[in-house]
Amino acid sequence: MKKARMTVDKDYKIAEIDKRIYGSFVEHLGRAVYDGLYQPGNSKSDEDGFRKDVIELVKELNVPIIRYPGGNFVSNYFWEDGVGPVEDRPRRLDLAWKSIEPNQVGINEFAKWCKKVNAEIMMAVNLGTRGISDACNLLEYCNHPGGSKYSDMRIKHGVKEPHNIKVWCLGNEMDGPWQVGHKTMDEYGRIAEETARAMKMIDPSIELVACGSSSKDMPTFPQWEATVLDYAYDYVDYISLHQYYGNKENDTADFLAKSDDLDDFIRSVIATCDYIKAKKRSKKDIYLSFDEWNVWYHSNNEDANIMQNEPWRIAPPLLEDIYTFEDALLVGLMLITLMKHADRIKIACLAQLINVIAPIVTERNGGAAWRQTIFYPFMHASKYGRGIVLQPVINSPLHDTSKHEDVTDIESVAIYNEEKEEVTIFAVNRNIHEDIVLVSDVRGMKDYRLLEHIVLEHQDLKIRNSVNGEEVYPKNSDKSSFDDGILTSMLRRASWNVIRIGK
């Protein structure tokens, strides 16, 4: 049997993980909000109309921050439509998803829901069809204590205390030709700079995210990032990254190698940020907000059909990917990659959270809620991936795929929780044919013992969970042993593993 070797030491530190790396995203899109988290009149809902079972599932994921309300949706969103008496709120055409937005949920309702799931809001402003003044008005409404037009409007709407939203996105995917109000890199750089400057006059404590490229495949990448930061470097704190992967070619081995592409993308953005830092002779670092990432491809044809042939509906079933086991493996691999860059990635948002390319699904028209395959790697990472990222030294067997060379069989990272005196090793065996023995030298962890080895595996890489039951769920494994500082773990072919040691 093949072997991989890894050395883990508490002195080999990358950075402490910012808990916001386990964030998510709720957009007014499809059934994410309506017929998702918000279903008034449903027996499963609370007095505010929010699904209690969905709230409990979100709590299982322990999501600390949620991006809202978009996404492409935000570029034609009028936030004023979603505040005040519900009966007075207008219905609007959502140009991004060819849907009807009823505005029954707005910033105040969403803030109330976020408190129920113990998350803070990451608010996006409309820089597509609107601009500086509207962004400032929204910030004033949300964060100013009172005594001004928009803060008093919030108080009149029954919300006395400000929401105190800390993180704000300056638009969404403004490099994309599909975006309402799409801009060139110079146009966006200027409006991002001026909007950021004005917003920080109102509330200097906020953190601002400038739009980076919609994916590494955009023709303007990475010149977009360089140009935008050339304008806005002094006023923003983060640059955003978005990336989705799919397996339309039905090539699993190559699909699982795409986390290597993710790593290249991240390194390129860091290099671009640091080039502008050097150019400006700045002492300030720009951090990364990877605020859209996931697997997304299953529903593409169905989505195109709905938007073309059945437009202008409330909560149409859009982007409802039902995930396979191999999708869960890539989500795990992407999480490992994000953790390895914890020194620069401070925020990340699994896109999305409920029904729309999501770990949580509610059946249509008020049916049961259930966990997708991708729920579990994210849950494990959010639960056990808190602490200091250690730099693992790995010697792994390699394989080639149709589009990638020298792909490591084993991808792994270790997290040291100093407070609990625990180390968690996350490892994916992305060899789809062979089991691999991972031998980890952890001799620096004196008096530690094996706590557990959790595994996510299935013989059928295309298997899915459903409302009728979970085919893919975590199990305890007896395939690890710990002796004299050497942790030996048998990693089944195509498996996600969480191996925990502690005192």
Curated annotation (Swiss-Prot):
Its EC number is 3.2.1.55. It comes from the Bacteria. Optimum temperature is 60 degrees Celsius. GO terms for molecular function: alpha-L-arabinofuranosidase activity. Pfam families: Alpha-L-AF_C. Transmembrane segments: none annotated. The active site is at residues 173, 292. SUPFAM superfamilies: (Trans)glycosidases, Glycosyl hydrolase domain. It catalyses: Hydrolysis of terminal non-reducing alpha-L-arabinofuranoside residues in alpha-L-arabinosides. The keyword Hydrolase applies. GO terms for biological process: arabinan catabolic process; L-arabinose metabolic process. The keyword Hydrolase applies. Alpha-L-arabinofuranose binds at residues 27, 72, 172, 244, 292, 352. SMART domains: Alpha-L-AF_C (SM00813). It is found in: Cytoplasm. Keywords: Carbohydrate metabolism, Cytoplasm, Glycosidase, Hydrolase. Pathway: Glycan metabolism; L-arabinan degradation. Involved in the degradation of arabinan and is a key enzyme in the complete degradation of the plant cell wall. Catalyzes the cleavage of terminal alpha-(1->5)-arabinofuranosyl bonds in small oligosaccharides as alpha-(1->5)-linked arabinobiose/arabinotriose, but does not display significant activity against linear non-substituted arabinan. It is also highly efficient in the cleavage of alpha-(1->3)-linked arabinoside of xylobiose and of the alpha-(1->3)-linked arabinoside decorations of polymeric wheat arabinoxylan. It exhibits very low activity against sugar beet arabinan. Belongs to the glycosyl hydrolase 51 family. Homohexamer; trimer of dimers. This is Intracellular exo-alpha-(1->5)-L-arabinofuranosidase.
